[in-house]
Structure formats: C-alpha cells, structure tokens
A protein has these predicted regions:
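Structured mid-to-C-terminal alpha-helical surface segments
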Residues: 1-53, 65-69, 81-334
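Betabetaalpha-Me/HNH-type nuclease active-site subdomain
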Residues: 62
C-alpha cells in the first residue's frame, strides 16, 4: 500500500477512477477507501502504539468481515487503557455512581491529553515520512478524542468528507477480538499495482458488534420524544439488518452472554437512565423505534444511500427484518 500512496498523482487518479467505474461507485469513495486501509496498515504495523489498539465499529464490519455493503468513513479504535496509566482491571473496580462518573471523566481527559501531546504529533511526523510530504493531521476541535487525517485527495464528493476521522476511546471493551485481513477496493481490482495488497488487523469479533448494534437500537427505541435521533443513525439499522442475514446472527445468539457483557459495560461507563439498558435482555429488548420516529429515520436512510452499494434494501425491508429480529431475540431462552 505504501508504494501506491507515493505513486504520481496521475497514476493514483487513474487507479481510483478505473476501480470506481468497475464498482459503480464515486471516485472519491474509492480513493478514501484506499486511505482508510493505508491508515489502518500504518496504525497496526508501524505506529508506536500498534500493540495497544483494536479496530471496531461499522468500518470493521465492511472491511474486515465483508458483512455489510456500506462505505464507512471513520476508523473506530479502542485504546488499551493501560497506555493511560491504569492497571488492567482498575476501570472495573466497584465505585459509587458519583465516583464512577468522576473516573469516567478523568479517563476521557487522560485520553485527550495523550492524543494531543503524544499520539497526534508522533503520527504526524511518521506519516509525513511515509508520504514524502507534510501529513495534515490534527485534533478535531469539537471532539478531542478524534484525530483527523486530511489525506492528500484528488477527488471530492459532497456525500463524503475528504478526511479520515480516527475516533479513539479508552472506555471500550477490546474482547473478543480476532485478526482479520483488510484490502482496499483498488487492490481487489488491480492487485498487481500493489506491492502489498492487504493487511492484518486486530478487530473486535462481529458477534460482539452485533450485540453492540442491538443495544444502540434499544437505546434509540427508548429515546425521549423531545430528543432528536442523531444524523446517520439509520446506518445502525442497516448494519443489523445485513448482519442478521449472515451466520453472525446465529453465532451471536449462541453467545447471548455477550449481550449482558455489552450492557454491563454501557451501564458502567456510559450510563443513561432513559436508555433502560437493564431491559436490553432477551424478553424485553427493543429494536423497533416508536411510530413517530419512522419518517425521520426513513429520510435519514435515504440521505445515506450514497454510502451503500450492491443490493440496497428499501427502508421498509430493513425495518421488517429488524421487527422480526426483535421477536427472535426476545424468544431466546436465557
């Protein structure tokens, strides 16, 4: 991948455009996909903290496990909290609600300092060396736990930002995880251009991500009417729809104890009374949002369609499957 990153602009432009034509995707999306894979390869193989991070989230579902046909713009990373000075089990110690809240805030503050003072300056220097030019890397002003890599883009597209967001948090569970191979779209279609066409990345197991997504939908089903659902949240419904069509669903059902692990984690580190996480268990789990949410969710899904490829289901089809999945989960015997 490094050889492609340093190709003349005209060669990269031709590579990304030809790949996009073959896939029926926008040029800018194919280009960004390459830089996402390049960045992952650097982070997990050459970065000083390569042994202290785990890949998670929607991008892992598409790139690592080929479970969804959705282009994901961001890289979600779990940072081993031992990098921040905590012992392995320290965050799990029993505390009062007040003390736990203080601990959570302190852990997030430590992560922000680490990213600003160590991580960001280091990768800026190292990626500049790899690219042979100044790498544009900085902390997001609105989210201090997000590092932005403004990669050297040749194409633009209003549906996607020409930057990669590295969303890095220490308050996340990094098990179970497995090694997965990740390959840029361009390498799939033009493998001979690449000296190295794929990379091995430590990634959260999709069974856990299945239950993570299910608890997000439960959270949204309980969101107060006065509170708007965040933009692009329809992606979570689509992701769970697609995962439910794969063997991951049965694997997740066979490991239903993972759901409790996910719920316990969220209740400890991301508590929110109205989310009713204690009800996110077989028998009472909610995936389907209230009727009054559906129009806004359908509009959000329509706005996200540019990020989907292959056989794109209708919103109605997605919600029908989600409704059936809710019934299936609630019929699981504990």
């Amino acid at each position: 991948m490094r050889n492609v990153a340093r190709l003349p602009e005209s060669d990269r432009r031709e590579l990304f455009r030809n790949t996009a034509d073959k896939m029926g995707l926008n040029d800018a999306i194919v280009e960004k996909d390459f830089w996402v894979c390049f960045t992952l390869d650097y982070l997990f193989h050459r970065c000083p903290w390569k042994g202290a991070i785990t890949f998670k989230g929607g991008t892992s579902l598409s790139k690592a496990f080929n479970l969804i046909s959705r282009f994901s713009e961001d890289i979600d990373l779990i940072l081993d909290w031992r990098v921040l000075g905590y012992s392995k089990d320290e965050p799990w110690e029993k505390r009062s609600n007040t003390k736990q809240d203080a601990f959570n805030k302190e852990a997030n503050a430590r992560a922000e300092v680490f990213l600003a003072e160590q991580f960001c300056p280091t990768i800026q220097v190292e990626l500049s060396q790899e690219l042979g030019c100044e790498a544009n890397i900085y902390i997001d002003e609105k989210d201090k736990q997000t590092v932005i890599f403004a990669y050297p883009h040749l194409f633009t597209n209003s549906a996607t930002l020409q930057v990669i967001r590295l969303e890095i948090g220490a308050l996340a569970a990094w098990t179970p995880a497995k090694i997965a191979q990740i390959e840029p779209y361009a390498a799939t279609y033009y493998p001979k251009v690449f000296a190295q066409k794929d990379t091995a990345i430590l990634t959260v197991a999709p069974e856990r991500t299945f239950w993570e997504k299910a608890t997000i939908l439960h959270h949204e089903a309980n969101r107060p009417e006065s509170s708007e659902m965040p933009q692009r949240y329809s992606r979570h419904y689509y992701d769970l729809y697609r995962m439910s069509m794969t063997p991951v669903k049965e694997a997740a059902f066979a490991q239903v104890e993972l759901l409790k692990t996910v719920v316990d984690f969220k209740m400890k580190f991301y508590p929110r009374a109205w989310a009713k996480y204690q009800e996110a268990t077989p028998g009472t789990l909610k995936l389907v949002p209230p009727e009054y949410r559906l129009d806004a969710l359908a509009e959000d899904y329509a706005n996200m369609r540019d990020m989907l490829y292959g056989n794109i289901p209708s919103f109605e089809e997605v919600m029908k499957v989600i409704q059936n999945l809710e019934k299936e989960i609630n019929s699981i015997k504990k």
